[in-house]
């Protein structure tokens, strides 16, 4: 079923909308939540919460990209749950992904508190990614949006785990230089 048809089911308030959404994007949503939370039960709850949020948001919203819309809801819910679960604990898979970027970026909480700065930073990162090859953009997004492991990224792109790690290290250095030149980082 096409995304436009699923969106029309939401507008018609058909109960099939959520089941069709789950059939098409359930695997993606669960993978995203699992990568952040590392708990199948919490991931399932976040995916269900995201589906409910989608039900309430459509209508009136009509997302241009249904997987991006639902993925963002899943990711936000998962990060909120993750923060609640690990308020005093550290060293999870998601922490390691974020710590790779935190060496030169503000912490995610600081960035959220400074909404304008976060938007400016996001726009600068998007511009940086526009200068990269498609494979490097996929590499970056799989690591820092989907929180995939180096092994998973390597398998997806047909490269070794070590190559994925090395390329991301180089990209982080390039990103830091780019953000400094753009005066996003001081």
Task: Give names to the regions the model predicted.
Residues 72-94, 118:
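Arg/Lys-rich amphipathic alpha helix in sigma70-family domain 2
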Residues 24-26, 36, 131, 141-148:
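Short helix-capping/turn signature of helix-turn-helix
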Residues 11-20, 30-49, 161, 184-186:
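Short, charged helix-capping/linker segments at alpha-helix termini
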Residues 99-130:
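Acidic, proline/glycine-rich intrinsically disordered inter-domain spacer in sigma factors
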């Amino acid at each position: 079923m096409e995304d436009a048809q699923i969106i029309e089911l939401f507008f018609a308030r058909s109960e099939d909308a959520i089941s069709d959404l789950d059939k098409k994007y359930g695997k993606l949503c669960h993978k995203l939540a699992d990568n952040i939370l590392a708990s199948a039960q919490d991931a399932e709850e976040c995916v269900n919460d995201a589906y409910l949020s989608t039900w309430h948001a459509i209508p009136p919203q009509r997302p241009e990209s249904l997987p991006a819309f639902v993925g963002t809801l899943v990711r936000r819910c998962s990060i909120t749950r993750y923060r609640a679960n690990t308020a005093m604990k550290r060293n999870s898979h998601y922490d390691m992904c974020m710590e790779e970027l935190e060496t030169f970026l503000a912490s995610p909480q600081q960035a959220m508190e400074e909404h304008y700065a976060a938007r400016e930073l996001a726009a600068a990162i998007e511009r940086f990614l526009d200068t990269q090859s498609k494979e490097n953009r996929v590499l970056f997004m799989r690591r820092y949006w989907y929180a995939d492991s180096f092994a998973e990224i390597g398998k997806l792109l047909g490269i070794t785990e070590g190559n994925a790690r090395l390329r991301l290290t180089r990209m982080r250095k390039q990103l830091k230089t780019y953000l400094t030149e753009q005066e996003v980082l001081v």
